[in-house]
């Protein structure tokens, strides 16, 4: 979107399990950002011209696929999903985790490797959720 010749930042939120939606709304209001929340099922969102909800259905990774397809250079993605963060970085988007920590090209490889290792250890029974 253009606003008086400037790119208006667009924020995409991986919304189903996002614990910081209220913070996103406040920042978006303060800075005039457009926000799209993407979810597998309907969510309650504030009635505001700059906030919209896209419900993609229950398919595996449907919300991730929608966000990765639509978020591009200059956009911001809020997600805790490391593979989605990687996809969005490749598209030129900036990515912030739900803890506020940014994912970057320099850190995403390590994050993906750590995720893979944890998944492998869980599957082999060497790591549990205590």
Where do the language-model regions lie?
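Nuclease catalytic cores that cleave nucleic-acid phosphodiester bonds
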Residues: 2-130
């Amino acid at each position: 979107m253009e606003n008086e010749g400037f790119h208006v930042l667009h924020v995409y939120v991986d919304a189903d399990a996002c614990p910081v939606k209220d913070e996103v709304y406040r920042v978006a209001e303060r800075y005039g950002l457009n926000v799209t929340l993407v979810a597998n099922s309907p969510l309650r969102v504030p009635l505001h011209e700059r906030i919209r909800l896209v419900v993609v259905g229950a398919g595996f990774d449907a919300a991730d696929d929608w966000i990765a397809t639509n978020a591009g250079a200059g956009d911001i993605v809020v997600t805790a999903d490391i593979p989605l963060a990687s996809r969005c970085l490749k598209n030129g988007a900036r990515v912030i985790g739900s803890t506020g920590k940014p994912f970057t090209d320099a850190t995403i490889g390590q994050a993906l490797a750590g995720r893979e290792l944890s998944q492998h250890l869980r599957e082999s029974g060497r790591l549990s959720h205590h």
